[in-house]
């Protein structure tokens, strides 16, 4: 029977992580459970840095960006001996189960702990929206709001100078944030990792737009696809239009979470406690068709496919 749980945030921070922690803590306390917060993700778990959390520990947290527990990259957690120390620390503290909030790397750590016999529940916390088994991740919609605001501002200056702007958006190897921002921001062109890309094809599309009378344009592109400064120089050289690159960077991860992320994080946090009390371990939580769902975390990581939002891309292209 579960009496005490641990909660940690891991990997890149995302707006809404604090709301998720709050959801876990308040739901657990309402069921008579104790909660230990673990500082700095798996690193803090390995180093046994924990704190008892009560309802006041998470007061005024639902609107705060980042994660008050902290987060850290800890690749050494791949080592089974390191994980064995982590499990020993959990058992020493009387912790019966662990809730992990983070991205795919965080899920991998939770999966490994599950394989070693320690029950974990994973909550998807990343702005990249690249987690299997869920339509949306905690932080995605806040990051989208941030990106669209930046695009709106760039459009003002691009329009004034009849300039082409290339905007690099986070997402790693997932184009969801770029696609959504392109539609919401009215971008003329979008480049995502799921679709083959060539500079020449992009330039031809831009030239076609200029021929139709476009005076300025915004190109949204997912990070890691190319050097955006070099791409901007190439576009300027081929089109004769002044072109500038903007890398939004880590500003996309910050800020107060939008209401949808607060609601999603709160629901997922409370749902994690429901699952643990129902005897589930080794699960990851998602939202599909606005319904909370859970999947076997090993199956989700190793076997599930994450569908590409091709309909979003088609929509963006129709609106160029």
From Swiss-Prot:
Q: Which GO terms describe its biological process?
A: canonical glycolysis; fructose 1,6-bisphosphate metabolic process; fructose 6-phosphate metabolic process
* Cofactor(s), by name: Mg(2+)
Q: Which residues bind ATP?
A: 12, 73-74, 103-106
Regulation of activity: what does the record state? Allosterically activated by ADP and other diphosphonucleosides, and allosterically inhibited by phosphoenolpyruvate.
Which pathway does the protein contribute to? Carbohydrate degradation; glycolysis; D-glyceraldehyde 3-phosphate and glycerone phosphate from D-glucose: step 3/4
Positions with a binding annotation for substrate:
126-128, 163, 170-172, 223, 244, 250-253
**Chain positions recorded as ADP binding sites:** 22-26, 55-60, 155, 186-188, 212, 214-216
Note the InterPro entries from the entry. Answer: ATP_PFK (IPR022953), ATP_PFK_prok-type (IPR012003), PFKA_ATP_prok (IPR012828), Phosphofructokinase_CS (IPR015912), Phosphofructokinase_dom (IPR000023), PKF_sf (IPR035966)
Instruction: Show the PROSITE patterns listed in the entry.
Output: PHOSPHOFRUCTOKINASE
Question: Which UniProt keywords are listed?
Answer: Allosteric enzyme, ATP-binding, Cytoplasm, Glycolysis, Kinase, Magnesium, Metal-binding, Nucleotide-binding, Transferase
Q: Which residues form the active site?
A: 128
Which residues hold Mg(2+)?
104
Reaction(s) catalysed by this chain's protein: beta-D-fructose 6-phosphate + ATP = beta-D-fructose 1,6-bisphosphate + ADP + H(+)
- Subcellular location(s) per record: Cytoplasm
CC terms in the record's Gene Ontology section: 6-phosphofructokinase complex
Q: Which GO terms describe its molecular function?
A: 6-phosphofructokinase activity; AMP binding; ATP binding; fructose-6-phosphate binding; identical protein binding; metal ion binding; monosaccharide binding
Main enzyme class: transferase
The UniProt record lists the EC number as 2.7.1.11
This molecule's function is given as: Catalyzes the phosphorylation of D-fructose 6-phosphate to fructose 1,6-bisphosphate by ATP, the first committing step of glycolysis.
Oligomer status and interactors? Homotetramer.
Q: Its family?
A: Belongs to the phosphofructokinase type A (PFKA) family. ATP-dependent PFK group I subfamily. Prokaryotic clade 'B1' sub-subfamily.
**Protein name, UniProt field:** ATP-dependent 6-phosphofructokinase
Q: Which organism is it from?
A: Escherichia fergusonii (strain ATCC 35469 / DSM 13698 / CCUG 18766 / IAM 14443 / JCM 21226 / LMG 7866 / NBRC 102419 / NCTC 12128 / CDC 0568-73)
């Amino acid at each position: 029977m579960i009496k005490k749980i641990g909660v940690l945030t891991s990997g890149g921070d995302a707006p809404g992580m604090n709301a998720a922690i709050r959801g876990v803590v308040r739901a657990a306390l309402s069921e008579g459970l104790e909660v230990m917060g673990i500082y700095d993700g798996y690193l803090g778990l390995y180093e046994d840095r924990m704190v008892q959390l009560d309802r006041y520990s998470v007061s005024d947290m639902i609107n705060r960006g980042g994660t008050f527990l902290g987060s850290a990259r800890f690749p050494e957690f791949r080592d089974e001996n390191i994980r064995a120390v982590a499990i020993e620390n959990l058992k020493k503290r009387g912790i019966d189960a662990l809730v992990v909030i983070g991205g795919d790397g965080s899920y991998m750590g939770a999966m490994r702990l599950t394989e070693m016999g320690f029950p974990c529940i994973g909550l998807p916390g990343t702005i990249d929206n690249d987690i299997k088994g869920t339509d949306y991740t905690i932080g995605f919609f806040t990051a989208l709001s941030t990106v669209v605001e930046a695009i709106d501002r760039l459009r003002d200056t691009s329009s004034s100078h009849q300039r082409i702007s290339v905007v690099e958006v986070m997402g790693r190897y997932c184009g969801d944030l770029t696609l959504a921002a392109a539609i919401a921001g009215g971008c003329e062109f979008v480049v995502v990792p799921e679709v083959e890309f060539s500079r020449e094809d992009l330039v031809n599309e831009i030239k076609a737009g200029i021929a139709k009378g476009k005076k300025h344009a915004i190109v949204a592109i997912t990070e890691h696809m190319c050097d955006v400064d070099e791409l901007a120089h190439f576009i300027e050289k081929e089109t004769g239009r002044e072109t500038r690159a903007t890398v939004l960077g880590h500003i996309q991860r910050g800020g107060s979470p939008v209401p949808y992320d607060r609601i999603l994080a709160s629901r997922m946090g409370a749902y994690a406690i429901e699952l643990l009390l129902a005897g589930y371990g080794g699960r990851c939580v998602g939202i599909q068709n606005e319904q909370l769902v859970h999947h076997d975390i090993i199956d989700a990581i190793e076997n599930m496919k994450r569908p590409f939002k091709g309909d979003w891309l088609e929509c963006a292209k129709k609106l160029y």
